[in-house]
């Protein structure tokens, strides 16, 4: 028995490795503070749970769901896009498809459009799935470095002409994981123009669309005139509604891109449990006040981490979005060396920036997914261990 050769090209999945290391230390009796994985610790809101309970009791939801999602779910997604972003004229029958979270839809989009020898343009640092899915599809990933001096936006002028001509997809993710960076509508306009020029499918991973603070409201790339000609956007309920375990989201945008994604999906999965789709519909109807109450929890945690690290000399500012704080390592350390130091001396688990790509070197990521008390304790442990930025 032998693995396929493609698996030899796949590095260990970052978060799985972090979890294994954490479990090994816990087995030894170490009190671990895990701020390494973006998995919200709060419960799913009560009205969503109630919608799920009612849907489970309805026997009509117990059979196979439509591959593309129920009509009711797709219409709710379209209505939410209109209400949230002002994106009008989306067709729920041809321009929306349900997904098992956004991760599977992202991966299956690579399978639908990338062939051997094709380039994918991916952010670096970035969600590891962009690179591994390129490998699974037989393509070649071209990294677009995200640098602090460019506000963690890719410099589109650095994409060589020969690469752009062979590129099938360009991936972006704003608000950004892991950097917490933001993108403007003006930047989206530049992306749309580039992708139109080279007939590249523009793919926007919008998993953190609602994870924003200080009054900021992240835009959709589909707000740009003409974007729907070349763009697909991926939405997930996982982070915004504390529903990571539910596995529900949708892809929306260009009808041809949705058709390709749907064709892969109909051959590899059987859709999302209809009761979960009912719960998702309730989630998209969540009152803005209630959603902001959820966000206020993460904003408080952000402030604890930022102020705590600032007190230890870190030159950082509070991010306006996502579940993460992107933090430079102290001078003289690599990201792996410093995160190992935090684990060994403080029992704190954080991922090294290099795990998100070569351009992530020099940083580590803090996830705002544990209680205020444990975040304060993490800062105290660092202080007690004499760990400072400089």
From Swiss-Prot:
The enzyme's E.C. designation: 2.6.1.83
Record flagged with keyword Protein transport: no
Function per UniProt: Involved in the synthesis of meso-diaminopimelate (m-DAP or DL-DAP), required for both lysine and peptidoglycan biosynthesis. Catalyzes the direct conversion of tetrahydrodipicolinate to LL-diaminopimelate.
Pfam families assigned to the protein according to its UniProt record, in alphabetical order: Aminotran_1_2 (PF00155)
Gene: dapL2
Lineage top rank: taxon: Bacteria
GO molecular function: L,L-diaminopimelate aminotransferase activity; pyridoxal phosphate binding
InterPro entries per the UniProt record, alphabetical: Aminotransferase_I/II_large (IPR004839), DapL/ALD1 (IPR019942), LL-DAP_aminotransferase (IPR050881), NHTrfase_class1_PyrdxlP-BS (IPR004838), PyrdxlP-dep_Trfase (IPR015424), PyrdxlP-dep_Trfase_major (IPR015421), PyrdxlP-dep_Trfase_small (IPR015422)
Binding-site list for substrate: 13, 38, 103, 127, 177, 365
Annotated pyridoxal 5'-phosphate binding sites: 67, 102-103, 127, 177, 208, 236-238, 247
Needed co-factor(s): pyridoxal 5'-phosphate
Catalysed reaction equations from the record: (2S,6S)-2,6-diaminopimelate + 2-oxoglutarate = (S)-2,3,4,5-tetrahydrodipicolinate + L-glutamate + H2O + H(+)
Protein name (Swiss-Prot/TrEMBL): LL-diaminopimelate aminotransferase 2
Family (UniProt): Belongs to the class-I pyridoxal-phosphate-dependent aminotransferase family. LL-diaminopimelate aminotransferase subfamily.
UniProt GO BP: lysine biosynthetic process via diaminopimelate, diaminopimelate-aminotransferase pathway
Subunit architecture: Homodimer.
Record-listed N6-(pyridoxal phosphate)lysine modification sites: 239
PANTHER family referenced in this protein's UniProt entry, alphabetically: AMINO ACID AMINOTRANSFERASE, L-GLUTAMINE--4-(METHYLSULFANYL)-2-OXOBUTANOATE AMINOTRANSFERASE
UniProt keywords, alphabetically: Aminotransferase, Pyridoxal phosphate, Transferase
Pathway note: Amino-acid biosynthesis; L-lysine biosynthesis via DAP pathway; LL-2,6-diaminopimelate from (S)-tetrahydrodipicolinate (aminotransferase route): step 1/1
Main EC class the enzyme belongs to: transferase
